[in-house]
């Protein structure tokens, strides 16, 4: 019997997503699925909504909709703390969509991080956009079928400008490509 590698947290979730997309269902994907369900059951993450988003997204790609339906009630929040970063607010939007609670107001909360003719910033008061926030925000907005036609050209241009020397940098001020962004 195949066993999933000894991974946890975001590493487990990302490995499961990649494995599901590249390999598909088999004994390893089943082992990954079981580990994710167990990990989401004892979630003690600093950002539980973001960890839940990543875990549920992994289950989505693994095709485990039964576990998603069982787990999603833990993430049904009607309030959104104002001090949360863009990736967490965007993650919450995706989680809400699984329980049919995504709203126009929730997508406006994500759009509040958009910087005109650029991308999305991590925090409301951050002066510049960054690649991670832009990617997560665009993913969340696309996931709920929000109309992103107006911001799409600027965001694509922003991402394109972050590709330097064979890899991606996090922001315009970054000079060194990072494997995390590539």
Predicted regions located by residue number:
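HEAT/HEAT-like alpha-solenoid repeats
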Residues: 38-45, 73-81, 111-115, 119, ...
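Alpha-helical repeat scaffolds
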Residues: 28-40, 67-77, 103-111, 152
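Short, charged N-terminal helix-start/capping segments
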Residues: 64-73, 117, 165, 172
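Glycan-recognition and catalytic cores of secretory/periplasmic carbohydrate-active enzymes
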Residues: 102-116, 153-165, 169
């Amino acid at each position: 019997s195949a066993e999933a590698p000894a991974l946890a947290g975001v590493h487990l979730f990302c490995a499961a997503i990649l494995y599901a997309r590249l390999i598909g269902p088999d004994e390893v994907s089943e082992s990954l699925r079981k580990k994710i369900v167990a990990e989401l059951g004892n979630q003690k993450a600093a950002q539980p909504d973001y960890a839940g988003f990543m875990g549920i997204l992994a289950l989505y790609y693994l095709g485990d909709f039964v576990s998603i339906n069982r787990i999603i009630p833990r993430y049904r929040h009607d309030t959104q703390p104002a001090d949360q970063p863009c990736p967490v607010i965007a993650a919450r939007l995706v989680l809400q969509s699984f329980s049919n609670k995504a709203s126009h107001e929730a997508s406006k909360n994500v759009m509040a991080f958009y910087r005109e003719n650029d991308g999305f910033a991590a925090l409301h008061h951050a002066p510049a956009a960054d690649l991670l926030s832009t990617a997560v925000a665009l993913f969340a907005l696309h996931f709920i079928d929000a109309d992103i036609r107006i911001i799409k050209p600027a965001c694509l241009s922003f991402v394109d400008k972050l590709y330097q020397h064979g890899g991606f940098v996090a922001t315009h001020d970054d000079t060194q490509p990072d494997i995390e962004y590539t």
